[in-house]
A protein has these predicted regions:
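ABC transporter nucleotide-binding domains
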Residues: 24-26, 31-227, 233
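ABC-family P-loop ATPase nucleotide-binding domain
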Residues: 1-30
């Protein structure tokens, strides 16, 4: 569905969704840095349980879009709602719905896996009564049980990605946003992370960015193609 047909696509499909409600709605969003336009008038919607790929070359606007969704930055104009919460008017509640894994695996390397995930649970204000159980569940879900007592600095790149993903998940967010989750991994690690993302898609809405067509076609059931800050197609 190309951009000149997008308005029709959005209105037509909005009425098909139960209750007319999407988990994420982005309407005519633009982000400018001075005179530089990072994303321009983008619109899309994501339903509960979808695994959505944001596909485009480097500098296309993928990370900017994800940073807006996750609450790291604010859009210049347009509207974003997460689970019905406006990202500007009800930013705290909107951010609570999101688990974000930025590109680059930002970990505290002097902490063990379990210590890091526990620390992330504290930052995300997970109730103390359920924090220990939540941490254990997330560690198991991301396949980190056998390495939970190892320092994160001593892990392979693939396991570091898993730890970062566990940190994003531990807040019990409904939406998981993954920025270039397989970048820098070897073929075996890529296969493992892709399988993990598919498994997480059974219980979460997942949005991931990539510049690799084969990756999003294997993992995602919906693809948003973006280039030079504009959405080119939605499939």
């Amino acid at each position: 569905v190309y951009m000149n047909k997008y308005k029709w696509y959005y209105v037509h499909n909005y009425n098909k969704v139960k209750g007319g409600i999407f988990v994420i709605e982005v309407k005519n969003v633009t982000k400018k840095y001075g005179n530089v336009v990072a994303v321009e008038d983008i619109s899309f919607s994501i339903k509960d349980g979808e695994i959505v790929g944001l596909l485009g070359p480097n500098g296309a606007g993928k990370t900017t879009t994800m940073n807006i969704l996750s609450g790291y930055i604010e859009q210049t104009s347009g509207e974003v709602t997460i689970e019905g919460y406006d990202n500007l008017k009800k930013s705290k509640k909107a951010r609570k719905q999101i688990g974000y894994m930025p590109e680059g695996v930002p970990l505290y390397t002097d902490l063990t896996v379990k210590e890091f995930v526990t620390y992330m649970a504290e930052l995300k204000q997970v109730d103390k009564k359920v924090r220990k159980e939540r941490v254990e569940n997330v560690i198991e879900k991301t396949g980190l049980t056998d390495v939970q007592n190892k320092l994160t600095r001593n892990l392979s790149r693939g396991y570091k990605q898993r730890v970062s993903m566990a940190g994003a998940l531990v807040g019990d967010s409904k939406v998981l946003i993954l920025d270039e989750p397989t970048v820098g991994l070897d073929p075996k690690q890529i296969t493992e992370i892709r399988s993990l993302i598919k498994e997480l898609g059974k219980t979460h809405t997942v949005i991931l960015s990539s510049h690799i067509l084969s990756e999003v076609s294997q993992i995602c059931n919906k693809v948003i193609i973006i280039n030079k800050g504009k959405i080119i197609a939605i499939d």
